[in-house]
């Protein structure tokens, strides 16, 4: 299977006043496969507003298209998961993501943030109930269903940015699910996505002993 992609990207930053900054961009893409062409226009915009000296708000919107899909038929991650491209039958996955966050820098050398997001997806792929790729991947287009997905969550973070010891600690509460046509996968009812992680904690610490020696430690909980 041969495919070709042509893409272009442009962005610019705007400082409207001393408090308000804006970033706007767009990604244009043309993907050609099996005598079928898919064109996508993917705009993105982000804005930051400085409420007071130590408090800022940030919001963003991003539209994306993806020309490969991840297919897996097991409830756990396997090395045999398949990445498959779009075809004449299989459309690109498209998503719209919104985010809103607040940032506090009132303590010297520290930054605290809270950010929420919501992502809506369409043309997501899953194997039909009772079907898997084991044995052969031939004819996989007839073994899958296309549906909708969503992902949402909130992340809290504390970050130390100055001094010999730096790092950050974050906690994320999130949810990701899928929904297919009635009579299809799970009889059309929403169900958790395979890689749904409701709670996650990440800790990273770096310490610089001198100009030549530093050490870093990371820990993650899912």
In which residue ranges do the predicted regions lie?
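Repeated loop/turn-to-beta-strand initiation elements of outer-membrane beta-barrel proteins
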Residues: 19-22, 54-57, 108-112, 164-169, ...
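Extracytoplasmic loops and strand-loop junctions of Gram-negative outer membrane beta-barrel proteins
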Residues: 1, 25-31, 79-87, 95-96, ...
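Gram-negative outer-membrane beta-barrel transporters
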Residues: 118-120, 138-222
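Hydrophobic, lipid-facing positions within transmembrane beta-strands of outer-membrane proteins
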Residues: 4-10, 26, 41-47, 96-100, ...
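Transmembrane beta-barrel strands of outer-membrane/channel proteins
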Residues: 24-30, 59-63, 81, 102, ...
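Surface-exposed extracellular loop regions of Gram-negative outer-membrane beta-barrel proteins
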Residues: 2-35, 40-44, 49, 54-98, 118-141, 160-177, ...
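Short sequence motifs at beta-strands and strand-loop junctions characteristic
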Residues: 2-4, 16, 35-39, 89-94, ...
């Amino acid at each position: 299977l041969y495919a070709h992609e042509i893409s272009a990207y442009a962005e610019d930053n705007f400082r409207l006043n001393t408090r308000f900054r804006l970033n706007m961009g767009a990604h244009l893409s043309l993907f050609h496969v099996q005598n079928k062409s898919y064109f996508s226009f993917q705009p993105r915009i982000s804005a930051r507003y400085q409420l007071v000296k130590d408090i800022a708000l940030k919001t963003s919107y991003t539209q994306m298209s993806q020309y490969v899909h991840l297919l897996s038929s097991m409830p756990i991650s396997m090395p045999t998961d398949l990445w498959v491209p779009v075809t004449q039958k299989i459309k690109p996955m498209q998503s719209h993501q919104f985010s809103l966050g607040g940032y506090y820098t009132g303590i010297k050398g520290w930054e605290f943030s809270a950010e929420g997001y919501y992502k809506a997806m369409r043309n997501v792929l899953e194997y039909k109930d009772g079907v898997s790729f084991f044995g052969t991947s031939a004819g996989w287009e007839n073994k899958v269903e296309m549906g909708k997905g969503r992902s949402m969550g909130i992340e809290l973070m504390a970050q130390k940015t100055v001094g010999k010891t730096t790092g950050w600690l974050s906690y994320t509460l999130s949810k990701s699910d899928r929904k297919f046509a009635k009579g299809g996968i799970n009889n059309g009812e929403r169900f958790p996505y395979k890689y749904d992680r409701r709670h996650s904690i990440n800790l990273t610490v770096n310490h610089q002993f001198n100009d030549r020696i530093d050490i870093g430690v990371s820990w993650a909980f899912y």
